[in-house]
From Swiss-Prot:
This is Alpha-1,4-glucan:maltose-1-phosphate maltosyltransferase. Its EC number is 2.4.99.16. It is an enzyme of class 2 (transferase). Gene3D superfamilies: Glycosidases, Golgi alpha-mannosidase II, Immunoglobulins, Phosphotransferase system, lactose/cellobiose-type IIA subunit. It comes from Bifidobacterium longum (strain NCC 2705).
Amino acid sequence: MAAVQHRATTRTSNTDNSTTKTKSKATSARKSPATKRKRVSAETARAAAALKGLAVEAPAPSIEANEPGQFGRINVMDITPAEERGIFPARVELGEPFEMTAQVFIEGRTKVGATAIVRNPRGKETMRRAMTCVNPGLDRWTVMVKCGEHSDLKPWEDGYAAVKRQLGEWTVTIEGWEDAYVSWLHDARIKVRVMDDVDNALNSGAELLARWAETPDTGLTARDRKTLEKAAETMADQTLSAEDRLAAGDNPTIAALHETHPLRDGISPSQPQRFKVERPKSSFAAWYQFFPRSEGATIDPNTGKIIQGTLKTSMAGLERAAAEGFDIVYLPPVFPIGVTNRKGRNNTLVAGPDDPGSPFGIGSELGGHDTVDPLLGTMDDFKALCQRAHELGLEIALDFALQCSPDHPWVKAHPNWFRHKPDGSIAFAENPPKKYQDIYPIDFNADMPGIEKEVERIMNLWIEAGVTIFRIDNPHTKPVRFWQDVIAAVTKKHPEILFLAEAFTRPGMMRALSYVGFTQSHCYFPWRNTKDELEEYLPVTNGDDGYYQHNTFWPTTPDILTAYVRDNGVAGHCVRAVLAAMGSPSWGIYNGYELIENKQRPGFEEQIDNEKYEVKVRDWSKAKQYGVAEMLTALNKIRRAHPAALSYHNLTVLPTSDPNILAFARHTPAELTGTGQADTLIVVVNLDGHNAHQSMIHLELSELGLPTDRPLNVRDELTGREFQWGWDNYVSLAPWADVAHILSVQ
């Protein structure tokens, strides 16, 4: 149903004009000797009923639920999403469409309606939308709403102050109300059809329409009120047939007024449901990762040795990320790397003289987490990198791995921050049978307040340098309360800062991390490759979990190279990119993906010659021969052009007839797109990187808000080709031609 606009309306009395018209018509009737019919207005019908001692049914009174658990005149309950444990509000990005549902009902056969009202942090109503009953048997009502308007403005850009004012705690209230018109219409149609107590039924309808016209908070225009008054007069006219009288109140014009400006009796608002509305890029984001030491790295022609890149040469990586349409550049730790127990190539225990070590073995005599590795440059170089990123419209996300090499300054300054063995030595990190001899884990039981204070100091330092996002390495191996305190302290001073959790762990821990402030998270998408796996996983990511845990889809990372990506070549890389970009509002690419770097280290699901342990020299001119960079660019362009890609709450899996063809749709109604036009994307992917497949794709047009009376004109956003679609549609996709369709409904 269309949005219901409610505003107080000062009505100019039309009594004199109405009376004049009635008298004129009565006079005209008296002039005709053949007829002595009497025409009555709705007011006359009501007065006549009162003189006969009849009770016209009173409208339901409005009763508010002033306390939690209290019911109003209309029952409203089981609202979703609800505040988790009554403490943690659901989280959405500014302008992100999301679904509200509730059970709304009343005693007996009376029909009800429901409306969702959105209010900003200052209590101002910003949206009011009628809900739709999707399951009458369970009294379940639903509607899509949004908090504020979507924006692409970055924290440093002009105009961001206006965005910032919209962030914070919003509320959505569900109002249940008695739908007197629909209740009357249901019974009146039956009574007229069987000619049972027709006059009472139609006079009741005339009274109802007249009351509807007089009600001040319906948002009716003067013209609308005239329409209802005239309909009431016609319905009360006993000179007309019962069918004609009923038609006065049962027609498309009255139905349209009911859709947009209904008569709402017994309005019963629920308790407001809180939502935490976060800044742009908290949900809808495109990430790009590269290692600064590999950007601009070259091979010395005289010695054959690698000359590593620096923060200055990393400007090329920024240019590439921006050209491909990404929003965020994610850098691994840029801090000094320890020497003691430094790892060699492919995570070997002994490093060679030219091995740079892992940037996750943090800290040396040159400094710790608050220092730039001199091999990369200086803090001024880092600030210049951030400044250039901002000029390109990119945010900088810095990896913050809270662990230390044996050479970290903390080891001497704060030995109590580390676990000690009985022999007095510090225990290195272990996850049996894996051992990380170059890393000392932190012991949070010794001095958590002291560690929190130091981490807050360091994060503030990098924020001042230009960082707007922290990607936290393995946050699930640290206390949740620690992160709760740190994130609260950092965002109190810098509310624009976002946190991503690199946490592959149990659902409970991932949910807890989202509660305490991690706006996005890595997830198990890389291992969801079959049709069955994806049909199960996509609705989970884009369902109720999406109100708290914003999964970011990465096809690969420095630590993850699955068999699917290894075995399916260019087509497989394109398939996984399409699934990542269209399957989640947040997705990311680790550089080298454009060059089909898909050789696994034997026995491990990671790349051989892992960039974590060495500098990689890449020839980016070869990227053109694969076409993957063009695919990444196209995907980001499509995402930015289509509001349907913005939300974690609008994905529907579509039935297909082939086990290798996956299809899903994203739909955002016109009222929520910001363009005034509905936006629907239909994504169809061939999961087989070696063979062509054909399939029928079924669309439930009405459920997707699409027209059912004519063919749909759809455009493939990847190729520009156009097709006509309907309920059932044939597709053929091949890895050497089109691996996917991304169809936009025109």
